[in-house]
């Protein structure tokens, strides 16, 4: 994909910066990470958490959610205008887990949002530091991507559950900005657009008046973001059609679903970033690491190095497997929910099993679960190698694929054949081939059919030893191509419920 002059790297999106050189980007990302770390340390002090309790990922998530809630201006405004019984719009909170007499106990805490905003700003040199907030949102989104399937959401919008590899970032809040848009998969944006079009079909005033004008601007902006993710002219031309439609309706929904399917073979560019839990950054800051001075990158070796020497714990339910819980969090940390399991496994240096074989539920614990029966164990988040995260979809190579997920979205820039069976994907393309976009559809289908394995394997750099910080000696791993590469294969993951 030709990089236009206007493209900002994701680190710039992430830090809201203008064009900067590599050193400045590393410094501003470092400043953002350091701010999250300082905030976390301060919150642990305020909550009087012990060192061990501060390393508990469930406590980290509660603290992260509190700061996101404190800065959610739209929702805060809504809560103040529509007061509900027993909910103080000025307060936020959640479960904090403490170790008391050898048992874990849950304590529900409540905090003034104003107080949390003060702590956050103080940790971020007095600024609002929205980049840090977005970073936390992306970590939560990556955790959801690894934990839940979105079958129901896909079916509701008329898409096929086998397209789950396109759904990265589907739980990101609207307010996640450019950095959020960069990590959203093709399917996620298609789903947002379909929801909009459906509202327009059901509500005559949706596109009308002053509000309608704003809605229209949002619609076109979203179409442009999606267009920017496609790498072929025909897909982009089809997006222009969808964007310019006077009155978007079922024809546009059809076109969008067609485009989403085409992305299983002609993949879109989706950014991947390693976003870690706040407690990891807190631990590093507490041990004297100066992120701003050292610089930091979300797509290089830095997150791997950080995880090599961070000890994070998690509560484990009685019948869960701690190794499986570790795999889940490792995948979330590296945004690898839709990556080929063989690639992830090679980098991690441990076998990575599909979601359906994991004996673990999500990381967060529901309020009705009995915490006293739970133990805590160390999450194994280290890796054998590291690899650069990719922002291109790469291309694809014909391979047997599964009944569950039928394509992958590469996370790591590692050379490999991409697994999926052309027949499975092409079967999705029978049906509607007339209308305004017929010539583009024909062109897209032709490209998909003529895709040859060799043009289509993913050309990446390879993996690197952890001692090879400058990425000088790429190791190109060889994979057993007969194994199953899809994470959501034959799956029984829980559905994501808000």
UniProtKB/Swiss-Prot annotation:
It is found in: Virion; Host nucleus. Residues 8-22 have a biased composition (Basic and acidic residues). One of its GO terms (biological process) is viral penetration into host nucleus. Keywords: Capsid protein, Helical capsid protein, Host nucleus, Host-virus interaction, Ribonucleoprotein, RNA-binding, Viral nucleoprotein, Viral penetration into host nucleus, Virion, Virus entry into host cell. It holds the Pfam family Flu_NP. GO terms for cellular component: helical viral capsid; host cell; host cell nucleus; ribonucleoprotein complex; viral nucleocapsid. Residues 1-22 are annotated as: Disordered. A motif (Bipartite nuclear localization signal) lies at residues 198-216. Late in virus-infected cells, may be cleaved from a 56-kDa protein to a 53-kDa protein by a cellular caspase. This cleavage might be a marker for the onset of apoptosis in infected cells or have a specific function in virus host interaction. One of its GO terms (molecular function) is RNA binding. Encapsidates the negative strand viral RNA, protecting it from nucleases. The encapsidated genomic RNA is termed the ribonucleoprotein (RNP) and serves as template for transcription and replication. The RNP needs to be localized in the host nucleus to start an infectious cycle, but is too large to diffuse through the nuclear pore complex. NP comprises at least 2 nuclear localization signals that are responsible for the active RNP import into the nucleus through cellular importin alpha/beta pathway. Belongs to the influenza viruses nucleoprotein family. Homomultimerizes to form the nucleocapsid. May bind host exportin-1/XPO1. Binds to viral genomic RNA. Protein-RNA contacts are mediated by a combination of electrostatic interactions between positively charged residues and the phosphate backbone and planar interactions between aromatic side chains and bases. This is Nucleoprotein. It comes from Influenza A virus (strain A/Swine/Wisconsin/1/1967 H1N1).
């Amino acid at each position: 994909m030709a990089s236009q002059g206007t493209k900002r790297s994701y680190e710039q999106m992430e830090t809201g910066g203008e064009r900067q050189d590599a050193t400045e980007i590393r410094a501003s990302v470092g400043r953002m990470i350091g701010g999250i770390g300082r905030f976390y340390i301060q919150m642990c002090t305020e909550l009087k958490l012990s060192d061990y309790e501060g390393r508990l990922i469930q406590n980290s998530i509660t603290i992260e959610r509190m700061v996101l809630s404190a800065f959610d201006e739209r929702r805060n405004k809504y809560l103040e205008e529509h007061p509900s019984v027993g909910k103080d719009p000025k307060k936020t909170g959640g479960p904090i887990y403490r170790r008391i007499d050898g048992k874990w106990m849950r304590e529900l805490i409540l905090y003034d949002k104003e107080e949390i905003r003060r702590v956050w700003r103080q940790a971020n040199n007095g600024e609002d530091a929205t980049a840090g907030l977005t970073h936390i949102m992306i970590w939560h989104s990556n955790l959801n991507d690894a934990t839940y399937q979105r079958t129901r959401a896909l079916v509701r919008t008329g898409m096929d559950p086998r397209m789950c590899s396109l759904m990265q970032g589907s739980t990101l809040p609207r307010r996640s900005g450019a950095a959020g848009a960069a990590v959203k998969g093709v399917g996620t944006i298609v789903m947002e657009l379909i929801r909009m079009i459906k509202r327009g079909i059901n509500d005559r005033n949706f596109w009308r008046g002053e509000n309608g004008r704003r809605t229209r601007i949002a619609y076109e902006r979203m179409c442009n973001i999606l267009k920017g993710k496609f790498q072929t002219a025909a897909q982009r031309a089809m997006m222009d059609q969808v964007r310019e439609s006077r009155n978007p309706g079922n024809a546009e929904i059809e076109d969008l679903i067609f485009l989403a399917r085409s992305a299983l073979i002609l993949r879109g560019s989706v950014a991947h970033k390693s976003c870690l839990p706040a407690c990891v950054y807190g631990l590093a800051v507490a041990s004297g690491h100066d992120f701003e001075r050292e610089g930091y990158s979300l797509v290089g070796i830095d997150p791997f190095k950080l995880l090599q020497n961070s000890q994070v714990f998690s509560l484990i339910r009685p019948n869960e497997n701690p190794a499986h819980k570790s795999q889940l969090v490792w995948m979330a940390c590296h945004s690898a929910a839709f990556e080929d399991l063989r690639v992830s496994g090679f980098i991690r240096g441990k076998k990575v099993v599909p979601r359906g074989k994991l004996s673990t539920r999500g990381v967060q614990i529901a309020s009705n679960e009995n915490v006293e029966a739970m133990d805590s164990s160390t999450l194994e988040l280290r890796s054998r190698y590291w690899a650069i995260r990719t922002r291109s979809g790469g291309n694809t190579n014909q391979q047997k694929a599964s009944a569950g997920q039928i394509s992958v979205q590469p996370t790591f820039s590692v050379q490999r054949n991409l697994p999926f069976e052309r027949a499975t994907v092409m079967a999705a393309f029978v049906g509607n081939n007339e209308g305004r976009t017929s010539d583009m559809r024909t062109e897209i289908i032709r490209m998909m059919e003529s895709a040859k394995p060799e043009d289509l394997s993913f050309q990446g750099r390879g993996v690197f030893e952890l001692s090879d910080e400058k990425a000088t000696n790429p190791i190109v791993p060889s994979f057993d191509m007969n194994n199953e590469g899809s994470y959501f294969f034959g799956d029984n993951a829980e559905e994501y419920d808000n």
